[in-house]
């Protein structure tokens, strides 16, 4: 019988203690946050009587009958809160050279790091193992103390009790009970009504149109399953509130160096002719002008097309930043992307008190216009490529003239040793990166480019956090990073947070949002629902990652506190563990080995190459991270940073080495670490892997949107964007990472979170029943049949109850989320438009790609616009995606005309059944109405080829259907022939 050990306090590191009856001391019965009596008493004295984790109030009788069982040693501050020397390390500030070196390099190792503490770690590990053998009943506190290096004991200081040092940086604000309770009740009622509805539908077939009835029932069952997958992850939505002032009070004290964590920004671009350099420049400028310590910000721009235009535009951007950044910080302007700041139609003098503002703003606007002219000149020059290729200003050939065969390129702008702003202040570091490409190597598109940036940034700056942005998403809120740090740097909340996701907001969308480009329902409803479970999914941009989570590590384990009802019997009864998959056990052991290395080796210094490689077991790390000792050493530094004594030239060569085309071969890159390969929607796959490891994510919605971007408002471009997303979901469904079964044995992914991921991969398959269901109204009108038998009073009440429950669910969802009914209706319309076009094509293309090996190449959506406002909205571009919805529109319109004609011929009795069929057809037409408007364009004209193909398909379908008439039963045809014979007689 094993003795139950007391958990450790998450505030001071001491044992929590037990009550007189032997149960563990639990302060908060809602979340069981581990805190000892001494720390709890301090919280009460300071007037904060709420739980540090969940925010629920403590019970005042919690101190009764408690026996403290603490260690006699001094208080130990948890290592998670130690953000001193490692966070503030110099991030390769002396790099200012350009390097273009092929992948065949002789690595220069010899960085002086980590000697004394490795030896102390080894000694303590040996002592700990010997002590366990001699004294198996050693207390938990003594074992915990043995894991902490000696130097950390010497540097221990009592917890800071100044104002703001212990205040929580964020709180969870639950949805009011009056709103969420009624919402849940209606969901349960809708489930019950659905069960009764399907019982009626299945037990009351339509014999005269059995095929139509069966098709409709199958479609309705699929729609119900799809609704369950979408609805239940929204069961527990929450809101969050951050306190940036408390973050500053804790980590930015007057007269001291800022202790805020460093952040590496990733900006990706491929084709500068389709992703205008001016848009990318605005994104970069908004990053460089952030309200964040300049020595903590580094911006990496990935040019995956190796275009000289991208490089030259970045040179111009770095030069203009010397004027723009001090102007933004002096006058605290928002947003800090010049194109969008100067285009704002607001009173820009509001809240401005400096007399010089108007003059300097006018001068800055003139400078920006000159900057735009220079950028436009670069774009105009790049329209025609010289036969001999591009040449740089010094006369040498541009290394990236062959975009598929070129060396790796890195250029560092600005920063500590680079150019300063016009006021002489240091600017954030700006780095141009173009990874090596050679024929015969798989490059994995955007995911491969992001992984190359992960390695380059780890070698040069190694910030503990990474923020990735698309090139067309600029920073709209200069304090966005501080918002994320309120979660990630909180020692209580942020320990197991892998990333903070911000919602996507867009500029340049028409007021009616015809094609639901804003995705308001997804970002304001679904994502907030996921935040109440295990966190939102990763959506590809506007995300702040914890670097260690990208390296495949598991979150730090939390002490487990048993509930009071079971604590008394925990020594006698043990729960039988479920058998685990051997591959999962191996991966868990591998992660635990790496986690132990991080915990114990994260702060090592001054160690030679030979002994270091012996201690770290370098071979196993190389199989995971690749053949770079410098990069491997950076992965062991949990708080990031680069040693001061590192040779800058060595780092540049090493950075070139880690972006070589063959670096990822025989490693875990893209499989277990970094952005995950296997789908063109690498964002969903990457976030899914992190959640399967036990990490959680957080959804941050500041009042001022953190980031804003552009969206394709043209119908064809929008459908191609949706096609890409849907194809990625089909690829994940057909891969080994399918959420239906992947990670089930680990038990780290919560059930509702798994349902949400299942919904993200199966939604394209809804297109098959949706196309069939949208065709049924036309068939019913053309044949005179219907999918529902004559309704009784009870059946009518059932149908009415179903419609009311659907409406109530939507209304109550709008009530707690704040989404408008117009946004909800646009979302429903485009769900049908995308379902019968892009999703349908994605299903077939996905199966062809995954099963037959036929690859589908996607081009980057052009982000240029018409001179007129919303000019792109009215442009009609030919694509095969337009044919299915156009055909459905024509078929249903023909069916409505045929139905009214038939009713006129048959008389008064035919009008009653007609209304049900016409309502069914108009339901389809109303959902496709935005598509119809998009086809008409500004001049109300549709491409002739679309009209011809659609009319041809609709006509052939109608004629064949009337000729075959397959859903008329044989008894009907027999009776019809007999009647004809009687008439002849």
Curated annotation (Swiss-Prot):
Q: What class of enzyme is it?
A: transferase
Primary location group: membrane
Q: Which UniProt keywords apply?
A: Cell membrane, Cell wall biogenesis/degradation, Cellulose biosynthesis, Coiled coil, Glycoprotein, Glycosyltransferase, Lipoprotein, Manganese, Membrane, Metal-binding, Transferase, Transmembrane, Transmembrane helix, Zinc, Zinc-finger
Tissue specificity is: Confined to secondary cell wall developing tissues such as xylems and interfascicular regions. Expressed in young plants, stems, flowers and inflorescences, but not in leaves.
UniProt PTM comment:
S-acylated.
Is Nucleus set as a keyword in this record? no
Q: How does it sit in the membrane?
A: Multi-pass membrane protein
**Cofactor note, please?**
Binds 2 Zn(2+) ions per subunit.
Result when mutating residue 683 to N: In irx1-1; reduced levels of crystalline cellulose in secondary cell wall
Instruction: Summarize subunit and interaction data from the UniProt record for this chain.
Output: Interacts with CESA4 and CESA7. Assembly with CESA4 and CESA7 is required for functional complex and localization in secondary cell wall deposition sites. Interacts with STL1 and STL2, but not with GOT1.
Function according to Swiss-Prot or TrEMBL: Catalytic subunit of cellulose synthase terminal complexes ('rosettes'), required for beta-1,4-glucan microfibril crystallization, a major mechanism of the cell wall formation. Involved in the secondary cell wall formation. Required for the xylem cell wall thickening.
Q: What is this protein called?
A: Cellulose synthase A catalytic subunit 8 [UDP-forming]
What is the organism of origin for this protein?
Answer: Arabidopsis thaliana (Mouse-ear cress)
